[in-house]
Amino acid sequence: MASQGTKRSYEQMETGGERQNATEIRASVGRMVGGIGRFYIQMCTELKLSDYEGRLIQNSITIERMVLSAFDERRNKYLEEHPSAGKDPKKTGGPIYRRRDGKWVRELILYDKEEIRRIWRQANNGEDATAGLTHLMIWHSNLNDATYQRTRALVRTGMDPRMCSLMQGSTLPRRSGAAGAAVKGVGTMVMELIRMIKRGINDRNFWRGENGRRTRIAYERMCNILKGKFQTAAQRAMMDQVRESRNPGNAEIEDLIFLARSALILRGSVAHKSCLPACVYGLAVASGYDFEREGYSLVGIDPFRLLQNSQVFSLIRPNENPAHKSQLVWMACHSAAFEDLRVSSFIRGTRVVPRGQLSTRGVQIASNENMETMDSSTLELRSRYWAIRTRSGGNTNQQRASAGQISVQPTFSVQRNLPFERATIMAAFTGNTEGRTSDMRTEIIRMMENARPEDVSFQGRGVFELSDEKATNPIVPSFDMSNEGSYFFGDNAEEYDN
């Protein structure tokens, strides 16, 4: 799976479907983001937002959440059947921020879900355009990945907080489909499976009857998705064991945690896509850009180019640093929360700092925060270079294990070494190599021990000037080998709580 990423052109990596050629893929991705842009413009008209207000990222997020909520079939059905006080199952809304007399004011709006669905379909040639909805989900997921830590969720499932770099996409909804599955990290899949197994342990009927059969199918499908992310035969064989287990229990949980740890060095292939806020696509469409005709790719130069000429604003709390807020959103836009900071800094052209050093909280503003003191500033989302997004995980020498780092899942296909603290990782593998998976475990540990931190990943791959749209002249950066580049170092971010 990893090798495909390098053999196919980056346009083809987008839709996972090998059946379309590059031009068709670029057109269909273009149609998708164009639809998002048209929807956003229409919503701004409905809400009578000024140009400035329409470029406010908080307004964009509210509008995105409204359409996602309007199309959330399962939740809508649940709300119909379990009416709760003060929640109208047919309506959706959120905070919209407007500029009044030199101040920002919050206005809570409410819309019929039916109306939102109508506007969305109208913007998407009458179709449901599920791909566009998933795209918005991935943007929200990437923003969460950059903003929050998942320590508590990791600990609850018996995993180690140091495995945070495996948690990409951990807040994606279940209904995010194949595109969502592609961007989920190994840790995210492991966590979903462990939760499922734990329910089975606690609830006798979980695997039984008609429902149990559906549950079992879902379990096996998730196992296969995770198996597809691993790149070594031993890891895949262990996944087969977990999938085929008659009655999944603690042994399977152990195996899964073992596999998650192994992924710190024997990295899984996880896709990265630059998904931008709806307002960015809206701005481009409003200025007359025809996405479908021009074609678009989420893994090439296009998102970089779009961000070079888009001005997006954000509300800023009194003691926040606007540059730090910009970094947070830049990382979210490029799905770079788990990338090596050396690589991100080089591409962005300004230093990208670890989260522990950021003076900024999340992008969204809570309903009880005081608007009186809110200011707004321009987000600096431009970059110095662009680079192709990867889905390989960066293991060197074709499929063999290579150095991983306790905290990186590469986003950009750019040559670098992946420094890591082997002692820290290997310490987690003492003891238990008996049981049905013993030979696979031994093999995995052997591969990990043979991994060398000085090996170079993405050999010969470089970044490109923004004028080099055909990616003809790679500039291969040289990095300080010793400097470990984890975003989560000295972390003090808030937990992600629904």
UniProtKB/Swiss-Prot annotation:
Late in virus-infected cells, may be cleaved from a 56-kDa protein to a 53-kDa protein by a cellular caspase. This cleavage might be a marker for the onset of apoptosis in infected cells or have a specific function in virus host interaction. It is found in: Virion; Host nucleus. Residues 1-21 are annotated as: Disordered. A motif (Bipartite nuclear localization signal) lies at residues 198-216. It comes from the Viruses. GO terms for molecular function: RNA binding; structural molecule activity. One of its GO terms (biological process) is viral penetration into host nucleus. Pfam families: Flu_NP. Keywords: Capsid protein, Helical capsid protein, Host nucleus, Host-virus interaction, Ribonucleoprotein, RNA-binding, Viral nucleoprotein, Viral penetration into host nucleus, Virion, Virus entry into host cell. Encapsidates the negative strand viral RNA, protecting it from nucleases. The encapsidated genomic RNA is termed the ribonucleoprotein (RNP) and serves as template for transcription and replication. The RNP needs to be localized in the host nucleus to start an infectious cycle, but is too large to diffuse through the nuclear pore complex. NP comprises at least 2 nuclear localization signals that are responsible for the active RNP import into the nucleus through cellular importin alpha/beta pathway. Homomultimerizes to form the nucleocapsid. May bind host exportin-1/XPO1. Binds to viral genomic RNA. Protein-RNA contacts are mediated by a combination of electrostatic interactions between positively charged residues and the phosphate backbone and planar interactions between aromatic side chains and bases. HAMAP family: INFV_NCAP (MF_04070). This is Nucleoprotein. The gene is NP.
